[in-house]
Amino acid sequence: MFKKSLIAVASLLAAVGTAQACSTLVIGKAVSETGNIIVAHNEDNGGRLFNMQHYVPPAKHKKGETVKFEKFAAEIPQVEETLGFYWTQTFVPDGASFADGFFNDAGVVVATNWCGEIFDADRMEVKDGGIGYGIRRLVAERAHSAREAVDIATKLLAEFGYFHDGRTYTFADANEAWQLAIHQGNSWAARKIHDNEVVYIPNNFMMDKVDLNDKETWRIEPKQVERAVKDGRHDAKNPIFNWRKVVAQESVRHERWNANRNVLAWKFLTGVEYNDPEKFPYSAVIDRKLG
């Protein structure tokens, strides 16, 4: 598993310097030239910074030990044993809670895209300050697969809540890739990326056609659907839940700095020029191999 995932980590640890904004591309193994899942990610952060690389070895922890990642965030109970992991750190004077990437000893890759600007009315209370950076770090320390990464992250969200506006997390191993879109509080949707698909996301929520009946491909925080029905953003009779439309205003979904990247990416990947932001795909099945 470790060797098969090396191409993923090579892409994940791409240099920051020339990026204009964060983007993530996931290529399923059936449409990858290597036969492996490929995760390509660039991390864009402005100002002066260092992009440092580390290896953190596996560790054993004392019973009752806790971890705290931001001064204002919740203390999280630590597990007894944690995995070793490679860590690409965006180091800035004031700290960067949402920029680091990871590749652990189980072959799990973690990368994220900022997806903010949610509806003000949707903000929720969080427990003891909530969790932010801890999601990625604890997944890197604990997850033995991409699917388990989703389980770990969503359990943390259920207990503490997310204090940031929102992000989309990409988790991949040698066999599966998943994306987890997190909205502030405890609102989220998770999608398994199929082997014959490609997914591209810039810095806005892209998940749209959440099939509430497809439990193998999709997972969603159930109370979010209830809230959307109550708010008039979703018809309870419709089994397809348009996640990005529910969580983000139209002006955010149409922002040009994201839309322009979507146009270019999907034209390259599919040969189709999408100009209407409401019609940008979340994923696509393609008939050629990429690498």
Predicted regions and their residues:
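Gram-negative bacterial Sec-dependent N-terminal signal peptides
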Residues: 2-20
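Short, well-ordered beta-strand elements within core beta-sheets of diverse protein domains
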Residues: 136-142
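A contiguous strand-loop segment
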Residues: 22-132, 152-290
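Short, charged, surface-exposed loops that flank catalytic or proteolytic processing sites
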Residues: 142-148
